[in-house]
């Protein structure tokens, strides 16, 4: 009997990436609206990517069975 392939969640595939060591990378959150209230340094620091914590990355990896 053939094993069934597990599907990867498309939404997770678009938002997160895995490093070579297995850490989960995502873009910084909280940059959609309300930027007028924030300081310029805060806005600047939210550019780029961030590495997710242990508990969050475990959840993301459940939805990416083949580490795409």
Swiss-Prot record:
Domain of life according to the entry: Bacteria
InterPro entries named in the record: Ribosomal_bL35 (IPR001706), Ribosomal_bL35-like (IPR021137), Ribosomal_bL35_CS (IPR018265), Ribosomal_bL35_sf (IPR037229)
Ribonucleoprotein among keywords: yes
Keywords: Ribonucleoprotein, Ribosomal protein
GO BP term (any one): translation
GO molecular function list: structural constituent of ribosome
Cellular component GO terms held in the UniProt record: ribonucleoprotein complex; ribosome
Protein name according to UniProt: Large ribosomal subunit protein bL35
Organism: Wolbachia sp. subsp. Drosophila simulans (strain wRi)
Record gene name: rpmI
